[in-house]
């Protein structure tokens, strides 16, 4: 079975085709980084308009590669969570295309797709496992008991880790999205030149808070000399603090659940220091294994949507005129 995946939850437009026998066949993506750099971030209305244009371009690109009318058996699209305008663009395209091709359409959960995205590389990851979802809008610790049964063990009370990365990078004068740029700058920083606080690490729960850390970084930047070395030192201190917080909480979750498998997913999972330190932590303390996806599948993409569609293909509905989206949608309640 071949599934066409459509991703438009935020500012990345993605289209992919996944074959249940051959794996991923096509994965195309268009990002809005140039536009976001102009405005210093994502403007929801502009993001929606860009999706409309990009979707046509990407679909035409796929049409040239494959005869999609004979090639696709089902369509899966991101129905939430995400920006309402962006979600509606993808959902409308998916439902319209499904209606015209007379094939089933399936709305899927964006964060479940992220959580299972490492399976694009590892094929199967045995349940149960702890999932660390770290992106621009989410920082969650998930207890994945089995496929489709997820428990939120820890949540972010304010700014997500990815958002804190981007906002701190902006204060340092780095281009958007700032997470990768901040990490590059941090690699040039002097270890322990600055020490940033680690909020909530001593709390018994598994929740996160990054707003205080972001404020501390802003105050440090304001007082700094603004030299490149000083900026690098701040970037390093900030990155070290975020990673420590994430791993301290994740370690507690693994210990609490008595599990040995950790999946790290979402845009921040591309951070190389996070990957390295998580492997050391899990191996040393639990003799366990860490799974994460290839870098191309860390940020928003349609490959993970198409793959999740393949796992949930029995739930697909015949094309209807009803367009379903759910901007606020928790992973522990997957029912529409």
Curated annotation (Swiss-Prot):
Disulphide-bonded residues: none
GO biological process: tRNA threonylcarbamoyladenosine modification
Subcellular location: Cytoplasm
Residues binding Fe cation, per UniProt: 110, 114, 300
Single GO term (MF): N(6)-L-threonylcarbamoyladenine synthase activity
Details of cofactor binding: Binds 1 Fe(2+) ion per subunit.
Positions annotated to bind substrate: 133-137, 166, 179, 271
Enzyme Commission code: 2.3.1.234
Cofactor dependency: Fe(2+)
Domain of life of the source: Bacteria
InterPro entries: ATPase_NBD, Gcp-like_dom, KAE1/TsaD, Peptidase_M22_CS, TsaD
Pfam families linked to this entry: TsaD
Chief location category: cytoplasm
Gene3D superfamilies reported in the protein's UniProt record: 3.30.420.40
PANTHER family reported for this sequence: TRNA N6-ADENOSINE THREONYLCARBAMOYLTRANSFERASE, TRNA N6-ADENOSINE THREONYLCARBAMOYLTRANSFERASE, MITOCHONDRIAL
Known role: Required for the formation of a threonylcarbamoyl group on adenosine at position 37 (t(6)A37) in tRNAs that read codons beginning with adenine. Is involved in the transfer of the threonylcarbamoyl moiety of threonylcarbamoyl-AMP (TC-AMP) to the N6 group of A37, together with TsaE and TsaB. TsaD likely plays a direct catalytic role in this reaction.
Protein name: tRNA N6-adenosine threonylcarbamoyltransferase
Gene name per UniProt: tsaD
